[in-house]
Every structure is written in structure tokens, then in C-alpha cells.
Amino acid sequence: MGIKQLYQVISENAPDAIKAGDIKNHFGRKVAIDASMSIYSFLIAVRSEGQQLMSDTGETTSHLMGMFYRTLRMVDNGIKPLYVFDGAPPKLKSGELAKRFARKSEATEAHEEAKETGTAEDVEKFSRRTVRVTREHNAECKKLLKLMGIPYIDAPTEAEAQCAVLARAGKVYAAASEDMDTLCFETPILLRHLTFSEQRKEPIQEIHLNRALEGLGMDRKQFIDLCILLGCDYLEPIPKVGPNTALKLIRDHGSLEKVLEFMENDPKKKFVVPEDWPYEDARELFLNPDVRDANDPECDFKWEAPDVPGLVDFLVKDKGFNEDRVKNGAARLQKNLKSAQQSRLEGFFKPVARTDEEKASLKRKHDEKIQEQKKKKKEEAKAKKEAKSRPRGAG
């Protein structure tokens, strides 16, 4: 799930933190990818007539189809992917996972009912809600990656947190995930939409944490508190706290402790905090997650030549993939993994830090932009109000 509406908050209040560009812009870069999030998206997106792809024996193959061709696309564009798989979820996450499982169980029942009585749209809608990544999906994807020569590692708990460790250490350029909570784990750069299909024509979003913090005017701890207020995987949200309210509360009070104190003492009692709301534990999971050091031997990885006969056996003979396409993909892997060894020029130069004057200028421009947006909203609200108060038929 990640952090609710965090992208909206950053795009509106720290627009300089986000760059949108073509996948080709990342040529020669190593990227740590949240494997579980990718597999989940493949199971949802790689479909035929609303149903997941199946082999002749009735086994799901959407995850393998997605993993093979989306990874190929990255390698074709000079990217060197490293997949990171989730370990055991933190205890605090078990409540959220239980809720998700209950929702999926309800969706499964609704899906069966829709197949009997509903429209094609109903069937597809409920079918997507029943999706969950199983151990078998993970095991098969690991087998496929090994045959492709693409490295993977297992995280002790959250994959996004381990991706962030590797990015901070400079072992990879960025962490790639659709989950915005990857920023809470302090990845310097987050890439989104990297594992999307080419047909979707979605640009790759590149989000820089330091620019987001600068634009929001927060330190990392305040940013984490903001994310907890917005709604994260570890806690249920506080009712009536949307993105604008969450941002205002943290800016006004500076920390979750002070925000909760304000809510407690508010005579209007506008906000009701859930009885069991261990925000300190959630904050600790973001600040000090269970991860391996980047220099741990289990975090070593390298790209190798694909095992073509092994790929044919697994994908063609076992899973019913097209043999010519698999062999063609293996040839592209061999060729493009070599060309991705070329270094990017940026690796030879250290980035120049912004001067205080440049920072002040950027902040001024950002503040002006925010003021313009506020002014525009006020004018729109005023025009709406005037239109409502105008008698019907008045020109």
C-alpha cells in the first residue's frame, strides 16, 4: 500500500523533487528493485480477457511473463537490475496484512458471484482484488532470474528498506518501487514505473529525497511523522486527516507527539485517534528497520550470462512459452548486459553542491509558486460562490 497521497503532497509542495523522464535516461545504472511489489503488479497487469495467464496445466504464468519481459526491457535500455525480495513482515504490519487478507477473501467471494451473475467489468474488478503474491510465485521468479543471469537478494524484512541501504551505500543508483514508503527508509532516489509495460507509455518518475525534504521544509523525522499521519502499512489512519490536514498539523506542531497533544486538548474534538495507535513503534521501524549492511556478503551480487537451455526447459517446456521468443530474449540479455557495462559520464564527476544563494533562490521560486496556487484556488472558490448566489436565468 505504501503512504497514502504522499506523491500528491510532494508534487504540490516540493515539485523540484520530482523528475519525469524516459527509461533510456537510466542507461548504465544499477537499480535495486522491490521484487514483491513488481510481482504483484505483474499478476494484476499481465492478463488476457480479465484472467491471469495460465499454462496448459492450469498454472498461473502472469508473474513469469511480466518478470521475463519487463526485465528484458530494462536490460535492453542499459539498466542493470537487482531484485530484492521481502523477508518476514514486521510484527506491527501483521494487523494491516490481516485486514488485506480479509478484503481479498471477500473479493474472492464477490468474484465468484460476479462470474455467475455480473458483467465482464465486475468479473475483472473483483478478480484484480483477489491477487496476492505467494511463496510459489516468489520461488518461480527467483528460479527465472537465476536462469536469466539477473541477481537477487533476500531482505530480512522489508525489501524497500534493504533497497534503500544499497542506494545510500552507492552500490546502486536508486531504489525502484511503486511504494512511496521507500522514501521513509531514506533512499536518496526513488524510481517509480520502472517495471511498467512499454504500452502504458508512463514516464519514469525519479524522486529525490533531499529535495523533497527541502521543499517541505522538514527534517527526516518530521517527514516520517507526516507519512505516518497520511497513513502507512503499520497503523490504521486517523479519521478526517487528509493530505492537506496532515501537512498543516506537522508544520504547525513539529512532531507527532505535539500533534496528538493538540488533538487531545482540542475542545472541538474534531479528530479521534484510534485507541491502539503505536506510532512510536511505526516511527522506529522506519528509522531503524531490520536490514543487512551493504557490505554484508549476502548483499554481494553480480550479473551473469543467461542459461539458454535452462530458460527453454523452464519457460517453454514447463510453462508453455513461445520457444522463438524465449531464445530471442536470451540473445538480447547476452548482448545488452555486456553493453550496460559501459560507464555513464556522470560517474567521473562529483556533483557540485548548491550555494546558499542558489538554495535561497530556489526556495523563493517555490514559495512564489505555492502563493500563486493558493491565489488561483481562492479565485476559483470565489467564482464558484458567485455563480451559486447568482439568480437562475441571470446572464
Swiss-Prot record:
Keywords: DNA damage, DNA repair, DNA replication, Endonuclease, Exonuclease, Hydrolase, Magnesium, Metal-binding, Mitochondrion, Nuclease, Nucleus, Phosphoprotein. InterPro entries: 5-3_exonuclease_C_sf, Flap_endonuc, HhH2, PIN-like_dom_sf, XPG-I_dom, XPG/Rad2, XPG_CS, XPG_DNA_repair_N. DNA binds at R47, R70, E158, G231, D233. Structure-specific nuclease with 5'-flap endonuclease and 5'-3' exonuclease activities involved in DNA replication and repair. During DNA replication, cleaves the 5'-overhanging flap structure that is generated by displacement synthesis when DNA polymerase encounters the 5'-end of a downstream Okazaki fragment. It enters the flap from the 5'-end and then tracks to cleave the flap base, leaving a nick for ligation. Also involved in the long patch base excision repair (LP-BER) pathway, by cleaving within the apurinic/apyrimidinic (AP) site-terminated flap. This is Flap endonuclease 1. Pfam families: XPG_I, XPG_N. It comes from Aspergillus niger (strain ATCC MYA-4892 / CBS 513.88 / FGSC A1513). Residues 344-395 are annotated as: Disordered. One of its GO terms (biological process) is base-excision repair. Belongs to the XPG/RAD2 endonuclease family. FEN1 subfamily. Residues 353-389 have a biased composition (Basic and acidic residues). Its cofactor is Mg(2+). The gene is fen1. Mg(2+) 1 binds at D34, D86, E158, E160. It is found in: Nucleus, Nucleolus; Nucleus, Nucleoplasm; Mitochondrion. GO terms for cellular component: mitochondrion; nucleolus; nucleoplasm.
